[in-house]
């Protein structure tokens, strides 16, 4: 069964937060009681993402070969590809008072991101983000029967002609979202503070082989489509050959404290953001575990407000935001929702799904 959306307002915020943290307390014996670092023991992490039960995945592949007519439906239903990434992280930088202006949480991989990837690609309940479909919305009797139309976040088949993009905020150093989700979108822009970017680029390049469904071009990573030797008198390039579709993948600095998209120099200051507007018809902003203290809330929401206004008014893009929160401080979660809904006037939905509710995480859809 697909997830449902609970439309939150200034009254239901508190009911939602109370219920979610009560659920969390009831599962305290099953869930890890830590801050959420994926693995603090090593400098290099090896992580595998795969469908639950590889035998099931192999069975699906055999069916697709025998019956091509059913392949689209099966591919859309759940991802069948597996991925293995190697992530270099820096525990010493995490505890440093000198690195990146003392903003160091991005130097390690936090567990919200791997959980989100597994849920998005392999959970049957996440199908609306893979299919692009209507999702049931609940918010009391006044919303009974209401549905929200969601564009695809990822296209597992490559058959959809719509152009989709992802803008990642607060990416950190891991680079695993772009090399995995980049297989299913047309443009991916990964952003963080300037001091994080070199390690982020290193990890993306290390795992570029996981982009199995795309050819990747990138100005920031200096990746170009290879040329092919001429055959006879023909001047043939890789771009002219029938092959994989192309992913535009960029890494860029984006400081939430300094961004000003009303500046007329936006195109020169943020060419990667312009790339999304110029190449896509819909964009999802993804932010995993970036709300962990109260000081980040206003800069983050101000950035979202600017991005939404600029991308919608300048490029007429469909704009959605997915925020993943590791449930630590109940006060921080409450303050984030209060400010998003009341002060910044965003429409915020809680993604209601059993798999998520059995974890330490929560995901919010913002429009």
Curated annotation (Swiss-Prot):
GO terms of biological process kind: methylation
Broad class of enzyme this protein falls into: transferase
Top-level lineage group: Eukaryota
Record's keyword annotation contains Nucleotide-binding: no
Keywords assigned by UniProt, alphabetized: Methyltransferase, S-adenosyl-L-methionine, Transferase
EC number: 2.1.1.-
GO MF term list: S-adenosylmethionine-dependent methyltransferase activity
GO CC aspect terms: cytosol; protein-containing complex
Compositionally biased region (Basic residues): 58-68
Residues given in the record as S-adenosyl-L-methionine binding sites: 110, 170-172, 192, 256, 288
Chain residue ranges for the region called Disordered: 55-74
Function: S-adenosyl-L-methionine-dependent protein-lysine N-methyltransferase that monomethylates 60S ribosomal protein L1 (RPL1A and RPL1B) at 'Lys-46'.
Family (UniProt): Belongs to the class I-like SAM-binding methyltransferase superfamily. RKM5 family.
Xref: PANTHER family: HEPATOCELLULAR CARCINOMA-ASSOCIATED ANTIGEN, RIBOSOMAL LYSINE N-METHYLTRANSFERASE 5
Record's protein name: Ribosomal lysine N-methyltransferase 5
Species of origin: Saccharomyces cerevisiae (strain RM11-1a) (Baker's yeast)
């Amino acid at each position: 069964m697909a997830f449902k959306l609970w439309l939150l307002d200034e009254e239901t915020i508190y009911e939602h937060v109370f219920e979610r943290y009560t659920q969390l307390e009831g599962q305290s014996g099953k869930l890890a009681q830590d801050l959420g670092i994926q693995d603090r023991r090593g400098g290099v992490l090896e992580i595998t993402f795969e469908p639950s039960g590889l035998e099931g995945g192999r069975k699906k592949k055999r069916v697709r070969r025998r019956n091509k007519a059913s392949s689209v439906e099966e591919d859309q239903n759940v991802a069948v590809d597996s991925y293995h990434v190697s992530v270099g992280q820096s525990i010493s930088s995490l505890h440093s008072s000198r690195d990146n202006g003392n903003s160091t949480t991005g130097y390690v991989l936090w567990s919200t991101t791997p959980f989100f990837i597994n849920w998005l690609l392999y959970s049957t309940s996440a199908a609306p983000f893979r299919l692009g479909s209507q999702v049931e919305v609940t918010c009391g009797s006044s919303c009974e029967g209401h549905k929200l139309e969601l564009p695809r976040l990822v296209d597992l088949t490559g058959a959809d002609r719509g152009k989709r993009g992802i803008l990642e905020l607060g990416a950190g150093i891991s680079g695993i979202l772009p090399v995995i989700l980049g297989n299913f979108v047309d443009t991916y822009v990964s952003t963080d503070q300037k001091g994080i970017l070199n390690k982020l680029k290193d990890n993306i390049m290390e795992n570029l082989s996981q982009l199995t469904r795309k050819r990747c071009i990138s100005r920031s990573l200096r990746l170009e489509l290879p040329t092919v030797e001429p055959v006879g008198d023909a001047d043939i390039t890789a771009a002219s050959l029938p092959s994989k579709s192309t992913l535009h993948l960029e890494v860029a600095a984006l400081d939430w404290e300094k961004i000003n998209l009303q500046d007329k120099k936006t195109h020169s200051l943020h060419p990667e953001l312009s790339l999304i507007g110029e190449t896509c018809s819909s964009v999802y902003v993804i932010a995993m575990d970036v709300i962990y203290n109260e000081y980040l809330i206003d800069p983050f929401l101000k950035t979202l407000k600017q991005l939404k206004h600029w991308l919608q008014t300048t490029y007429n893009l469909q704009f959605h935001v997915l925020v993943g929160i590791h449930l630590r401080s109940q006060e921080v979660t409450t303050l984030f929702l209060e400010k998003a809904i009341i002060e910044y006037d965003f429409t915020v939905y809680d993604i209601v799904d059993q798999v998520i509710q059995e974890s330490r995480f929560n995901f919010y859809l913002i429009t």
